[in-house]
Swiss-Prot record:
Entry-linked InterPro entries: Ribophorin_II_2nd, Ribophorin_II_3rd, Ribophorin_II_C, Ribophorin_II_N, Swp1
Signal peptide (from-to): 1-22
Glycosylated residues, chain numbering: N106
UniProt keyword list: Endoplasmic reticulum, Glycoprotein, Isopeptide bond, Membrane, Signal, Transmembrane, Transmembrane helix, Ubl conjugation
Protein name (database record): Dolichyl-diphosphooligosaccharide--protein glycosyltransferase subunit 2
Cytoplasmic side: 562-571, 618-631
Domain of life: Eukaryota
Glycyl lysine isopeptide (Lys-Gly) (interchain with G-Cter in ubiquitin) cross-link, renumbered residues: K154
Pathway assigned to this chain's UniProt record: Protein modification; protein glycosylation
Signal found in the keyword field: yes
Protein's membrane topology: Multi-pass membrane protein
One Gene Ontology cellular component: oligosaccharyltransferase complex
Lumenal side, ranges: 23-540, 593-596
Length: 631
């Protein structure tokens, strides 16, 4: 540990938390992400569609394809003048390639104009209108708008509506595009919110990105601010840039288009504020360095950064406010060394100004200022319980170990006193973790106590063997005393071997060896005690109940004897005999179930008896019916 009075060293650890004013971006394109996106778009052309995604996607990122002439030749050689989609890809691609002009015949022009019809799907109308616009051919915007509006009534999917927005951005500004613009609000209502951070269509990221790009392109075209809240824009941004690797060209193209729209439109430019360097950078001076950029990690040239206020996270006291950052290269810096902040956490509220388009431009930064802790006034004492002998006190200086041993027994207590100070400022410190650990040199047993400061911030630990015997299991011996100091804001956590302490407990309270030896011996067997069966009713009650149950049967026999039983139609055919025997067997099975069987056993037997009885009874009744018909 550096001695007191050494030069101050601050440790800045920075994290961004959500601003209370607005949602903070959690995803954006870092410089590495932008290069990865460019690599995803820079692929060999396989057809006109892939060429369109590569050429226009790279153009959105401000990059030309490596070989413009070769790309133009590929477009011309693969163009099908009789296909609207082919014409769309060629027109949009050639438009961003310098010096790539494609001549169009009258037949092709008529083909494109004919495709702008309410009988065509919206995708076809979009491709035709964009192709006419790309080739610089005249277009009746009102007629195209009428066809587009008519088709919107028939196609209500999210994709069709987004393509309608894309189409409208190619129409004349004099056309009444209000109905198309109103579709933006309807699309926003169809977005799904995830955890208050993300906003997307259930169709996925690609369509969400195309919606953002189409919305801002159309709003720039008509000169109207989009009907989206700032938080919704940030949620859409978080969704679009949450993915860093792309499986298809079309997905990479959609993300590039959305990134260009969010960084260059006339209404909303999300601000990305990133602390420079790692969150564990050590600085010789207390300097907060911030990189301020758009979603493409491009520096905002017009930005002006200002500290609104800095508050202690513990006390909420304001320690700094209304302080501008200075621009050094592309980094904004705030030097607050002169403020001499004590160690701890501080909440810095930073605002980016300079352009009315900036959104998410107020962020909260959690700044951790670390320091070094010093241990002073360390006293080790043995205090007589009867106070008949004056305390023996020994002062120790960190990191040395106290000479000799200290004794704590039934006659005297052991005490440790110390103070913790900030090495850089001399201020008193109260770290979160201040422990005293006693380690038995023979058995390895460890006992840990918390050291608490008093009202003067003097830490005290006192060991009374009569009160602490439970924690030690009354195990006497020589213990090594360690002092442990730790805190998230401390640069130098401390583990200090302070002294050796001999602790003696009364012999009769020594730890039981029987307990330790019996840990792995068989335990006494646990005998399960079943619940006593419930008392059965007296035999008289049971017999009376049985007689009542059988009384209807006795009555039946008595009536048969008196009026006679009609058995004239009884035959001794096999089906008749089997039916009656089966019926009797089922009644007998019920008795056996009552006395011996369980439900599942009974059901198996009953299934066999029931099947035989049913078949025999069915045969018996059929024979009886035939016999009655014959008579």
């Amino acid at each position: 540990m550096a001695p007191p009075g050494s030069s101050a060293v601050f440790l800045l650890a920075l994290t961004i938390t959500a601003s209370v004013q607005a949602l903070t971006p959690t995803h954006y394109l870092t410089k590495q992400d932008v290069e990865r996106l460019k690599a995803s778009l820079d692929r060999p052309f396989t057809d006109l569609e892939s060429a369109f995604y590569s050429i226009v996607g790279l153009s959105s990122l401000g990059v030309q394809v490596p070989d413009v002439k070769k790309a133009c030749t590929f477009i011309k050689s693969n163009l099908d003048p009789s296909n609207v989609d082919s014409l769309f890809y060629a027109a949009q691609s050639s438009q961003v390639l310098s010096g790539c002009e494609i001549s169009v015949s009258n037949e092709t022009k008529e083909l494109l104009l004919a495709a702008v019809s309410e009988d065509s799907p919206i995708a076809q109308i979009y491709h035709a209108v964009a192709a006419l616009s790309g080739f610089g051919l005249p277009l009746a915007s009102n007629e195209a708008l009428g066809a587009l509006t008519a088709r919107l009534g028939k196609e209500e999917t999210v994709l069709a509506t987004v393509q309608a927005l894309q189409t409208a951005s190619h129409l004349s500004q004099q056309a009444d595009l209000r109905n198309i613009v109103e579709e933006i609000e309807d699309l926003v209502a169809r977005l799904d919110e995830l955890g208050g951070v993300y906003l997307q269509f259930e169709e996925g990221l690609e369509l969400t990105a195309l919606f953002v790009a189409a919305t801002y392109k159309l709003m720039d075209h008509v000169g109207t601010e989009p009907s989206m809240k700032e938080d919704q824009v940030i949620q859409l941004m978080n969704t679009i840039f949450s993915k860093k690797n792309f499986e298809s060209l079309s997905e990479a193209f959609s993300v590039a288009s959305a990134a260009a729209a969010l960084s260059q439109n006339r209404y909303h430019v999300p601000v990305v504020v990133v602390p420079e360097g790692s969150t564990s950078d050590t600085q010789e001076q207390a300097i907060l360095r911030l990189q301020v950029s758009n979603v493409l990690s491009q520096p905002l040239a017009q930005a002006a950064v200002k500290l609104e206020h800095a508050k202690s996270a513990a006390t909420r006291a304001t320690v700094l406010q209304k302080t501008p950052f200075s621009l050094v290269g592309n980094v904004f810096e705030l030097n607050f060394k002169n403020v001499k902040l004590s160690s701890g956490y501080y909440d810095f509220s930073v605002r980016v100004e300079g352009d009315s388009r900036y959104i998410a431009n107020t962020v909260e930064l959690r700044v951790k200022i670390s320091t070094e802790v010093g241990i002073t006034n360390v006293d080790l004492s043995t205090v007589d319980k009867d106070q008949s002998i004056a305390p023996k006190t020994t002062r120790v200086t960190y990191p040395a170990k106290a000479k000799g041993t200290f004794i704590a027994d039934s006659h005297q207590n052991f005490a440790l006193f110390f103070q913790l100070v900030d090495v850089n400022t001399g201020a008193e410190l109260t770290p979160h973790q201040t422990f005293v650990r006693l380690h038995n040199q023979k058995t390895g047993q460890e006992v840990v106590f918390v050291a608490e400061p008093d009202n003067k911030n003097v830490y005290k630990f006192e060991l009374d063997t009569s009160e602490r015997k439970i924690e030690f299991d009354s195990a006497s011996g020589t213990y090594t005393l360690y002092l442990i100091i730790g805190d998230a804001t401390l640069k130098n956590p401390i583990l200090w071997n302070v002294a050796d302490v001999v602790i003696k407990f009364p012999e009769e309270e020594a730890p039981s060896t029987v307990l330790s030896q019996s840990l792995f011996t068989p335990k006494q067997e646990i005998q399960h005690l079943f619940r006593e069966p419930e008392k059965r009713p007296p035999t008289v009650v049971s017999n009376t109940f049985t007689a009542l149950i059988l009384s209807p049967l006795l009555l039946l026999f008595a009536l048969w004897i008196r009026i006679g039983a009609n058995v004239s139609n009884f035959t001794f055919a096999p089906s008749t005999v089997i039916f009656h025997l089966g019926h009797a067997a089922m009644l007998g099975l019920m008795y056996i179930y009552w006395t011996q069987l369980n439900m599942f056993q009974t059901l198996k037997y009953l299934a066999v008896l029931g099947t035989v009885t049913f078949l025999a009874g069915n045969r018996m009744l059929a024979q009886h019916a035939v016999k009655r018909t014959a008579h």
